Amino acid sequence: MDRAQKEQVVEELGQIFDASGVVVVARYEGMTVAEMQDLRAQMRDAGGSVRVAKNRLAKIALDGKPCASIADYLTGMTVLAFSDDPVAAAKVADKYAKGNDKFVILGGAMGDTALDPAGVKAVAQMPSREELIASIVACIGAPASNIAGAIGAPASNIAGILATLEEREAA
């Protein structure tokens, strides 16, 4: 890899570190190509990406970035998992690590907050942005549906009583 290619890699990684909501660093030593492709596919489905880069170039790209705290984890065979959604990459990495002993989470960063492996696991257990929005909408909509039910209930009760009275008169 010549100098121009290295500069391009550093630039790309810098853009990734700036744009990502979360970055997870993991060791992938011993993983097969098929396993790595499976990880990439799962991450892509969740809206994230996986990138293998030279640690030295990644450390240069981290200089001055909010997630610079992950530089300490960049030793050995490491892979970077990242996503715009603050929890997507952590969720996929945590799930994949549970099913594959060769994939070991070393740590990560969420913005300027450093995460150890337990921190990445905690982020992975958080609900996603879509799940949070759905629960907020449900909370907002619940009072309205309760009011509609309360308003409609007396009318249905009266209709039931009238139907019962009609049946008694007919009998």
UniProtKB/Swiss-Prot annotation:
<dbReference type="InterPro" id="IPR022973">
    <property type="entry name" value="Ribosomal_uL10_bac"/>
</dbReference>
<dbReference type="InterPro" id="IPR043141">
    <property type="entry name" value="Ribosomal_uL10-like_sf"/>
</dbReference>
<keyword id="KW-0694">RNA-binding</keyword>
<dbReference type="InterPro" id="IPR047865">
    <property type="entry name" value="Ribosomal_uL10_bac_type"/>
</dbReference>
<protein>
    <recommendedName>
        <fullName>Large ribosomal subunit protein uL10</fullName>
    </recommendedName>
</protein>
<dbReference type="Pfam" id="PF00466">
    <property type="entry name" value="Ribosomal_L10"/>
</dbReference>
<keyword id="KW-0687">Ribonucleoprotein</keyword>
<comment type="function">
    <text>Forms part of the ribosomal stalk, playing a central role in the interaction of the ribosome with GTP-bound translation factors.</text>
</comment>
<dbReference type="GO" id="GO:0070180">
    <property type="term" value="F:large ribosomal subunit rRNA binding"/>
</dbReference>
<dbReference type="GO" id="GO:0003735">
    <property type="term" value="F:structural constituent of ribosome"/>
</dbReference>
<keyword id="KW-0699">rRNA-binding</keyword>
<keyword id="KW-0689">Ribosomal protein</keyword>
<dbReference type="InterPro" id="IPR001790">
    <property type="entry name" value="Ribosomal_uL10"/>
</dbReference>
<dbReference type="GO" id="GO:0015934">
    <property type="term" value="C:large ribosomal subunit"/>
</dbReference>
<comment type="similarity">
    <text>Belongs to the universal ribosomal protein uL10 family.</text>
</comment>
<comment type="subunit">
    <text>Part of the ribosomal stalk of the 50S ribosomal subunit. The N-terminus interacts with L11 and the large rRNA to form the base of the stalk. The C-terminus forms an elongated spine to which L12 dimers bind in a sequential fashion forming a multimeric L10(L12)X complex.</text>
</comment>
<dbReference type="GO" id="GO:0006412">
    <property type="term" value="P:translation"/>
</dbReference>
<dbReference type="InterPro" id="IPR002363">
    <property type="entry name" value="Ribosomal_uL10_CS_bac"/>
</dbReference>
